[in-house]
Amino acid sequence: MLAKRIIPCLDVTNGRVVKGVNFVELRDAGDPVEIARRYDEQGADEITFLDITATSDGRDLMLGIIEAVASQVFIPLTVGGGVRALEDVRRLLNAGADKISMNSSAVANPQLVSDASARHGAQCIVVAIDAKKVSAEGEAPRWEVFTHGGRKGTGLDAVAWAREMAQRGAGEILLTSMDRDGTKAGFDLELTRAVSDAVPVPVIASGGVGNLQHLADGIQRGHADAVLAASIFHYGEYTVGQAKQFMAEQGIPVRIGS
């Protein structure tokens, strides 16, 4: 079985790492280069950088930050936020990103995912899906895709959208539960499992990690291939090394050491 990955996530706005609850109430968590270096030293498998206000503010790509991080950090970097065209994908890859994450732009122009995958390979195209439960109590569970940092509903069904994105050439799905984001209540395992079981590509579970058991649950009960977390790592509650140790003790295959 392939090793399961632990991925710290750095939400960036105006050049600083921030963390919020349910996509709002942002608080400062530090300098992206310093934080990325710390996670590299702790044994993170990858790091994800998301410029969470680039699309809604109409800002350009964070090329300078990515160049600075890539010069000091030697694990794969996934970068998203403000990617609107094929040229943006190329510029971020040239700046040192290994994978490019698309969210709002994939909804606005699904062909961009197909084109980027055809040109650069599925292995470096990630589609990020921010999903919110919209079914009523007692109904079959349904989740809607939101864009623009969670501010705009799309009417798209999250499971069907994930399936379409995989068919169009996304090599990975980064799935965030908006209901759980920043709450520390654990992943939305029902959502994670529904998407993981529906697509043939790896799914990264995101949104809601409050302890190490939640990470293990994302893999074992949510069927995710990787787990992403922010708060528990940023504020020093746990290290990536402790998370890997815990998961190994639960019988989950992880990479420990170089």
UniProtKB/Swiss-Prot annotation:
CDD domains: HisF (cd04731). It comes from the Bacteria. Keywords: Amino-acid biosynthesis, Cytoplasm, Histidine biosynthesis, Lyase. SUPFAM superfamilies: Ribulose-phoshate binding barrel. It catalyses: 5-[(5-phospho-1-deoxy-D-ribulos-1-ylimino)methylamino]-1-(5-phospho-beta-D-ribosyl)imidazole-4-carboxamide + L-glutamine = D-erythro-1-(imidazol-4-yl)glycerol 3-phosphate + 5-amino-1-(5-phospho-beta-D-ribosyl)imidazole-4-carboxamide + L-glutamate + H(+). One of its GO terms (molecular function) is lyase activity. The keyword Amino-acid biosynthesis applies. Its main location: cytoplasm. One of its GO terms (biological process) is L-histidine biosynthetic process. Heterodimer of HisH and HisF. HAMAP family: HisF (MF_01013). This is Imidazole glycerol phosphate synthase subunit HisF.
